[in-house]
Each structure stands twice: as C-alpha cells, then as structure tokens.
Amino acid sequence: MAVTRRKVLVGALVGSGLTLGFLLRPRSYPLPLEPREGEFAFDAWLRIGTDGVVTVAVPQVEMGQGVTTLIPQIVAYELGADWRQVAVEPAPVSARYANLPLAAKWAPMWMPLAPSLADDTDGVLTRRWAEGHRFNATADGTSLAAYEAPARAAAASARAMLMQAAAARWDVVWEECEAHG
C-alpha cells in the first residue's frame, strides 16, 4: 500500500474529526444528591425537606478554612432561608463538583506536554479532564472560586421555583413574592 498525499490528508482529517468529536461530545452526569423521604433535590447542591430544613452538600474537606460554613451561608443567603434551618453534609464524589480552578492551576501535572492549553478555567480541556476524573481535591484556597457560582445558581433557581409554587397557590404574580426564612 503506497502512501500518497491524498491518503495522508484523509487520515489527518479523519483523526482530527474524531478528536474534535470526542472533545465536544456533550456529557451528562447523574444527580449526586438523592432526595430522601419528604425532600426535594435542587441540582447537585441542596435538598429542601417538607419540614423546611435545607441540606447543603459541601464537596470540600473541612480543614480549618471554614468551607462547611461558607458554602451553606451562600446558599442560605441566596435562597432566603433561615440559617438555623440549614444543615450540611459532605458531597459524594461526582463530576458535578469538579474543582476547575485547581485543575487549571495543576495542569502541568496532568498535562505536562502542553500545560498552557489549560490556562483558562472554563477551557474545554480543563473541564473534560476535571469532570472525567471527578477531580474533587481540596487545596490552594479554591473553594470559593470553584463552588460559589454553581451553589448560588442552584439556590437561586430553587428560590424561584418555590416562589412560583407559592404564587400559584396564592394566585399572585410570582415576581411580587419575596423569600424570607
């Protein structure tokens, strides 16, 4: 079999297409928090019980940095919940809790040939690697940078859903409702 320029180009195009298809293939991960009896799960971050207790999943290990207070306070504030009704539990290992800022900082260890490709914390390579390896490491003070936005978004969406449910029950416009305690 002779190697021709056409065969080399076809091989390069096929290989590039397969690589690009693999990198851009959408991935979904199961919800790591299973609601218990009388609870409802909102994304990977919180469960709300019918008794009003809000349980927040914390994917970092508490080593004196206050992460088991910080993330639940963010959720409670965004949700409009009473702080006395907030419980904390360790999050299970899951791709949903991938620590992207730390994965980008540690890129020279997991991608030694081209670490500069992982400089952007929202980069495709960093996200694919961190989620694919369920990278949930606690280090380098990245708890707030890694988890504030997704925890806040989960709490905000839960607050909006609860306000919509209350508005439907009270027959008012949900934008007029406020969440307190």
Regions found by a protein language model. Give the residues of each.
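Cofactor-binding beta-sheet edge motifs in enzyme active sites
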Residues: A2-G181
